[in-house]
Amino acid sequence: MIHDIGSVCTYCGVGCDITAQVENNKILKIYAQSDGYVSQGKLCIKGKLGFDFVDSPLRIRNTRIKKSFIETNFESMPRELKARSNTLVSLDEDWFEATHEFGTSVAAWKLSEIKSTYGRHSFCATGGARTSCESGFLLQKFTRETMDSPNIDNCARVCHAPSLNGMAATIGEGAATNPYDDIYKTEFMLVIGSNTTEAHPIVANRMIEASRNKTAELVVCDVRNIQLGKFATKQVVLPYEANLLFLNAIAYVILKEFLYNP
């Protein structure tokens, strides 16, 4: 029986609404509902066709434990875990295949041992930027409450911590302040350092539409001659690594000519 499952695309930060058509626990196709608020009924090629990995034979389907880990830690294992180790199945020269229950029990025991031996600061966790809010909440809760560790991080911090601080100081919030459809209400769009049609195609659709309809001017500044530049009112192809210099030049002119609101 074929049925639909609604979800959110995780390929980029746009967050398009998607619907997966599923039969016998396998995805047949992914599409956007015609009334989708974010997607507007359209998906990029990655959102629409990028799901083959779900059923890839290369995916690891069962719990695995390193043979070297068992050899190193077997003597210090609790008796109950030693007794259950006979359920391990040799997969190759490096790995055992284990039941999910045994794998989680071994992981819980080892984490508890590390915490009691080396203290709470011996543990840290790094989350992913493409996971759900619920899994992010669960990871930080596990780190702070179960492991009693303040060492929780996210892969997005490396590149977005500076922008978060800068945006918070400038506009009061380190995140987007407007919904995508506000693009249709704006008069001017400045794109710098973003290949929007490649990285965030569904947002680029709105920008192109607004530019074509002459409701907003579009200025594109990039070190590459990107596709979005074809739809721009003005395009500036910058020398490599000149983004910051260009922004400083704009700031200089604004200050010198008093083009800011006092």
Ranges and model annotations:
Residues M1-E257:
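N-terminal export/assembly segments and adjacent metallocofactor-ligating motifs
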Residues F258-P262:
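Internal, active-site/partner-interface "lid" segment
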